[in-house]
């Protein structure tokens, strides 16, 4: 997240690892280490420390960053804690509010989060694997639709619909002057990004590529 924001991309912080506190302590401990938090901290405090670290280490570049939050019913409690941390940090510091401006929701229904995003005035993106959720995104007021093909890491699609099939369909049905469409899943180099632009996409989301 920090490296991406400092390079001029949108840096996104993952927020899912706190759910592994009991089930996968190694993952949880590493997450806390990266967040500059203690394993004894409560989840909201861990998120605050992580976002604050990103904020501090992107000051020189004036980097823009955001949070990626899974919002499915199974992890709603974790999502609520993330939202609490976001709200409290942004309301306490105008500069934090200016640069911590993006919320990416994923793996669930965007509709229940519409009021929160509207109140916070954040740029809202949602990652989804099909047309039905894209329609929910439009109804909820999501500003950037991120169509996730079957190639995507941690994809949530039940059907193997790939990016080159899904993305142009979403662009045709939902792209307009108020809604941007990006692709994710399999985009990893200049050629694949150019392909997304050729299909009419406004951008791409990449994650695994930065670990390869």
Predicted regions and their residues:
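Active-site entrance/lid segments in N-terminal catalytic domains of soluble metabolic enzymes
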Residues: 1-177
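Short hydrophobic "strand-cap" motifs at the C-terminus of beta-strands
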Residues: 184
């Amino acid at each position: 997240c920090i490296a991406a924001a400092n390079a001029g991309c949108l840096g996104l912080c993952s927020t899912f690892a706190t759910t592994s506190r009991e089930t996968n302590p190694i993952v949880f401990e590493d997450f806390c280490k990266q967040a500059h938090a203690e394993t004894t901290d409560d989840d909201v405090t861990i998120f605050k420390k992580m976002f604050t670290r990103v904020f501090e280490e992107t000051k020189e570049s004036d980097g823009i960053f955001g949070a990626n939050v899974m919002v499915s019913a199974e992890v709603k409690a974790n999502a609520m804690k993330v939202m609490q941390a976001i709200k409290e940090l942004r309301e306490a510091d105008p500069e934090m509010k200016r640069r911590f401006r993006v919320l990416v929701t994923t793996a669930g229904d965007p509709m229940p989060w519409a009021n929160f995003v509207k109140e916070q005035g954040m740029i809202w993106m949602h990652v989804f694997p099909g047309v039905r959720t894209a329609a929910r995104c439009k109804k909820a007021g999501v500003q950037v639709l991120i169509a996730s093909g079957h190639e995507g890491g941690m994809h949530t699609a039940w059907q193997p619909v790939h990016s080159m099939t899904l993305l142009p369909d979403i662009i045709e049905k939902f792209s307009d002057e108020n809604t941007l469409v990006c692709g994710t899943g399999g985009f990893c180099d200049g050629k694949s990004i150019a392909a997304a632009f050729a299909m009419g996409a406004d951008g791409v989301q990449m994650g695994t590529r930065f670990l390869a």
